[in-house]
């Protein structure tokens, strides 16, 4: 089998199949994401999705745990820094947000992600 085809099956088809199977069991979006994270704890995209789902449903303590775990496992996952910092600002925790933004600015700079870098610098200047 072609290595690219194998990667497509593992990273695209398998998760979609899993979603369809789980959806048939009437799982919530959060339960589906939790199952993905349990299956692949190092998968940044799944953990980011879970953290964002927790933010969107108001479970900020679970969101914080997932953002911190994500950044511990995948320190180069730049979008997480901005979203985590925005959540902390809404939670009236500007000092914590500053710390996350400073880490995120460093990560975005290393990654060459100028858009995220400018957004994080702008948010940091507002705090």
For each predicted feature, which ranges?
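Structural marker of alpha-solenoid helical repeat scaffolds
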Residues: 39, 73, 107-111
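Residue at a conserved register position within TPR or TPR-like alpha-solenoid repeats
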Residues: 54, 88, 121-124
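Canonical positions in the second alpha-helix
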Residues: 35-36, 69-70, 104
């Amino acid at each position: 089998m072609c290595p690219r085809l194998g990667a497509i099956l593992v990273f695209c088809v398998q998760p979609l199949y899993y979603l369809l199977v789980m959806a048939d069991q009437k799982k919530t979006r959060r339960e589906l994401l939790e199952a993905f994270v349990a299956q692949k704890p190092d998968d940044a995209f799944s953990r980011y999705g879970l953290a964002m789902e927790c933010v969107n449903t108001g479970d900020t303590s679970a969101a914080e745990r997932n953002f911190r775990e994500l950044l511990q496992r995948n320190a180069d996952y730049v979008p997480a820094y901005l979203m985590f910092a925005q959540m902390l600002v809404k939670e009236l925790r500007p000092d914590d947000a500053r710390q996350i933004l400073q880490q995120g600015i460093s990560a975005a700079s290393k990654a060459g992600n100028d858009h995220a870098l400018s957004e994080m610098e702008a948010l940091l200047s507002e705090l």
